[in-house]
């Protein structure tokens, strides 16, 4: 690779008086000839003037020197030239120079895009030594104004006209040096040594780079200027004293061969020191043939590692892919092994559960003592509560016939324990009337006093308590409270209404400020802990399934909404019964929960009480999904009594408010939209319309009075509750015929044929597997 040294100033010495200055390309250049490169024939000066042209070319291994002798006596011109630039001439190779520059630029861009980062770093490292040489040469002697003056003064003896021209060259050189010194203040500037013309784009790029690096290089530039001002004498002495870097001041005894040896010696090469960041761009641009290449390569090279990663060799890629595949296979094997182990554990657990169930059933069948039977029955009950999948094994072991026969024993405690385990397994007794009778109560807070007025009228017409009128009672939120008080605790309506009002006054009394703080903290205006404490004191900690011990208790359910299973809320049924194995309900639920937990979960209205966590499920008010549980109750009854017809469904609402004001606006606000969404979720009339159209006539009865005021759920003032009670009574009076029809249906007794069928079914279940006559 050839190394080109470019000088900012060239000095010509012309012996001809016509011209002192020469032109190279578009710039006026001056050259001076050293004594070692020319000689004069002292014998006959006018006859012949011998000059020698010294051309030097350096590369990495050697330096080539050549002499060209000229005898221009015909032209009367005698000159000697020293040229330390090996840049391409302007003559015949002009086109090839431009093409090589374009080719170098394209090669640099292609290498920046497709090459690796290491190749770019190697490419940039090659520019630094030449830039160092350029700085060293330009600073030492040839660019200094005083050296030019000394060279011109030493040549005054040959021509007087040359002296005048040399003064002109001196002024040109002075201004050139001044421009160079002023250009040093900018990081990116144009020097006269650059032979490549950039045009307008060069100025735009230079201004952009100088403005970007100006703040960073300000301190170092100030320090450098100060050092130059403090040592002017030292620079002057260095420029005037002979040195190895100044060609014009070399001694005469030094031959060109010695110069060649020194330049070819690797130990005499100038040491390449790291160049500062503010000078690196100028050094790249100072190279006439590779300036653009260095500039493009220097700026794009830093972006290539970010845009393109280093290509990996095929063995490395294969090794990485093999490791990745091995890791994936290892994970798959571990996952498969874990799945197999889990499956084995489930199988072992299921086998152990089945074995435990068989052992308990066989132990119960071998027991003859009534007291020991109670213990065995309770053990089996707790086992099936913990592992419901064991019910199928117990049925296969003929547990139902034995329990039915055991229920005939005259022991109330044993009979209660047997009724509980039969309800848990899913065995049910026949219904009370001619068909299934269902009572459902909507949610609505303290507006439940409206439903109490309807129930009071039914009790008055039938002369029977509520728990004897219906086979299945289901409620949501406040309706669940009424269902438990009437169906499980068998409270009279007067006592139930009094307790209902007391619960409202105890729970729905809260300071506004305290409630607002609680709302922001737990999203509940009222104290949920107080509500839980009241429920525990009033209801107790008995399990739902334990209520089946009482033969007079109907099937009771409370509805809540699970909000953390899947993307949509799901209804959850707290039951006091279990489904027979093989019967699948559409709704989640269980009978192993406590009664107060069921009411707490069903009444967790958002904004009023905090949501209730029960196990891994998060429960909220059932009214969010099914505020009218009539359809759910009908489905559950079909699962319990699949072969029994439906006699009637009585659905009780807590009052509805319908405004006659019509909004004529063409759009609705966000508040109105949210209110409509909430109203549609808690709407009860759509279910009523659906069931009324699907069920047979005189089967579905809905009682939901229209109230004149939109009373909130947490209303606890007595005057407002009395107003609701009065509106409920007026509604009953207007629908007196409808109430009488319901009372008549509920008062009907079973026919004789139905009673015989029930007796036969009981005997067949009790003596399953025995001959027919033994069942009688």
UniProtKB/Swiss-Prot annotation:
A motif (DGA/G) lies at residues 621-623. GO terms for biological process: arachidonate metabolic process; arachidonate secretion; cardiolipin metabolic process; fatty acid metabolic process; intracellular signal transduction; linoleic acid metabolic process; lipid homeostasis; phosphatidylcholine catabolic process. One of its GO terms (molecular function) is lysophospholipase activity. It is a single-pass membrane protein. The gene is Pnpla8. Its EC number is 3.1.1.-, 3.1.1.5. This is Calcium-independent phospholipase A2-gamma. It comes from the Eukaryota. One of its GO terms (cellular component) is mitochondrion. It is found in: Endoplasmic reticulum membrane; Mitochondrion membrane; Peroxisome membrane. Pfam families: Patatin. Expressed in myocardium (at protein level). InterPro entries: Acyl_Trfase/lysoPLipase, PNPLA8-like, PNPLA_dom. Calcium-independent phospholipase. The modification N6-succinyllysine is found at residue 730. Pathway: Phospholipid metabolism. The keyword Membrane applies. The active site is at residues 477, 621. Residues 439-634 form the PNPLA domain. Calcium-independent and membrane-bound phospholipase, that catalyzes the esterolytic cleavage of fatty acids from glycerophospholipids to yield free fatty acids and lysophospholipids, hence regulating membrane physical properties and the release of lipid second messengers and growth factors. Hydrolyzes phosphatidylethanolamine, phosphatidylcholine and probably phosphatidylinositol with a possible preference for the former. A motif (GXGXXG) lies at residues 443-448. It catalyses: a 1,2-diacyl-sn-glycero-3-phosphocholine + H2O = a 1-acyl-sn-glycero-3-phosphocholine + a fatty acid + H(+); a 1,2-diacyl-sn-glycero-3-phosphocholine + H2O = a 2-acyl-sn-glycero-3-phosphocholine + a fatty acid + H(+); a 1,2-diacyl-sn-glycero-3-phosphoethanolamine + H2O = a 1-acyl-sn-glycero-3-phosphoethanolamine + a fatty acid + H(+); a 1-O-(1Z-alkenyl)-2-acyl-sn-glycero-3-phosphocholine + H2O = a 1-O-(1Z-alkenyl)-sn-glycero-3-phosphocholine + a fatty acid + H(+). Residues 221-239, 247-263 have a biased composition (Basic and acidic residues). Keywords: Endoplasmic reticulum, Glycoprotein, Hydrolase, Lipid degradation, Lipid metabolism, Membrane, Mitochondrion, Peroxisome, Transmembrane, Transmembrane helix. Residues 216-276, 306-334 are annotated as: Disordered.
